[in-house]
């Protein structure tokens, strides 16, 4: 099965309910789809009126060993009292299989959206990220990848070269902007950072608030620098971002030491995410869910804006990185 061409067309509601029934769960409500394009995720209620979420993993994106490492990390975090949505075990197994689909069941954790402009909530998130990384430092992922230039820049560049989605009249300018951005990132990238296990996709949309933060969706967990789990929480102008980052770091360091030299990786990581995200959309284009939800990807205006975004980010990389106040 080719990962890029795979679709979830054969994953019918009956298939999902049969998979759950095999493990003793009777669905007593409808299956409510949750917002996930990479996997298929549904919320439901069982006959005891308990709410769960079932996640069916996209085949061939992660191996069984890689998914199990994600689950083991989540369970270690829960054991260390870090608020994370961790999978439910059935006869000691968290990774289940039905008709070739890997899936896992999680307790449904409700909550409000994390308020990225709420400094008190930001402080609490920083504190728990410090605890998360305290656990993350105990060992590394063996099977899951480490953040690096090849996965985030070099492989996407090859994909762009062969892509038919990019309008022919705009492709040369887009590839030139991509190459300049890759060169700028490469010039500012460093690999002497301390590597630890990360959430990997720690942005406001993956944090719920219930008298404190609840971290969800470890699907992108991998090894990398601590700052990867911090920078996506920053928003606003540079002064606001400085205050937010100082708040996070001060709370974070109650549990884990933070190397402030990693602040210089924020803009390279932002650039890498821009490139990687676009490549992800293009790899998934054969899945009908993607043209339906991202129709603008075929428009010339989008590629003009994307080219401009890459050019602007390359310029940002030439500027000094975010500076903390002297006390740091």
Swiss-Prot record:
Sequence positions that bind Mg(2+): 206, 217
Cellular location(s): Cytoplasm
Induction remarks: Induced by the two-component Cpx system that responds to extracellular stress.
Gene Ontology molecular function, alphabetical: ATP binding; magnesium ion binding; protein serine kinase activity; protein serine/threonine kinase activity
Cofactor or coenzyme needed: Mg(2+)
The protein's role, per its UniProt record: A protein kinase that (auto)phosphorylates on Ser and Thr residues. Probably acts to suppress the effects of stress linked to accumulation of reactive oxygen species. Protects cells from stress by antagonizing the MazE-MazF TA module, probably indirectly as it has not been seen to phosphorylate MazE, MazF or MazG. Probably involved in the extracytoplasmic stress response.
Protein name, per record: Stress response kinase A
Species per Swiss-Prot/TrEMBL record: Escherichia coli (strain K12)
Lineage of the organism: Bacteria, Pseudomonadati, Pseudomonadota, Gammaproteobacteria, Enterobacterales
Name of encoding gene: srkA
């Amino acid at each position: 099965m080719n990962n890029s061409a795979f679709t979830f067309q054969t994953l019918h509601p009956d298939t999902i309910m049969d998979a759950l029934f095999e493990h003793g769960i009777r669905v007593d409500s409808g299956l409510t789809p949750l917002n996930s394009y990479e996997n298929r995720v549904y919320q439901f209620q069982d006959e005891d009126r308990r709410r769960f979420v079932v996640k069916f993993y996209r085949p061939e994106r992660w191996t069984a060993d890689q998914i199990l490492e994600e689950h083991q990390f989540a369970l270690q975090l829960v054991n260390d009292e870090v608020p994370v949505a961790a999978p439910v075990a059935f006869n000691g197994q968290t990774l289940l299989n039905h008709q070739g689909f890997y899936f896992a069941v999680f307790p449904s954790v409700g909550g409000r959206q994390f308020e990225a402009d709420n400094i008190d909530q930001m402080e609490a998130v920083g504190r728990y990220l410090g605890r998360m990384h305290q656990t993350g430092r105990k060992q590394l992922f063996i099977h899951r990848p480490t953040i690096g230039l090849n996965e985030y820049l070099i492989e996407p560049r090859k994909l762009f070269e062969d892509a038919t989605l990019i309008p022919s009249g705009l492709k040369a300018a887009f590839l030139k902007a991509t190459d300049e951005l890759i060169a700028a990132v490469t010039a500012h990238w460093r690999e002497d950072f301390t590597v630890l296990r990360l959430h990997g996709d720690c942005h406001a949309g993956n944090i719920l608030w219930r008298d404190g933060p609840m971290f969800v969706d470890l699907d992108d967990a991998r090894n990398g620098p601590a700052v990867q789990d911090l920078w996506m929480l920053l928003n606003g102008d540079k002064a606001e971002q400085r205050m937010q980052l100082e708040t996070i770091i001060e709370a974070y360091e109650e549990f884990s030491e933070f190397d402030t030299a990693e602040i210089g990786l924020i803009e390279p990581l932002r650039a890498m995410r821009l490139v990687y995200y676009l490549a992800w959309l293009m790899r998934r284009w054969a899945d009908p869910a993607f043209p339906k939800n991202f129709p603008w990807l075929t428009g010339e205006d989008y590629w003009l804006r994307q080219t401009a975004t890459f050019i602007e980010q390359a310029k940002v990389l030439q500027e000094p990185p975010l500076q903390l106040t002297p006390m740091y």
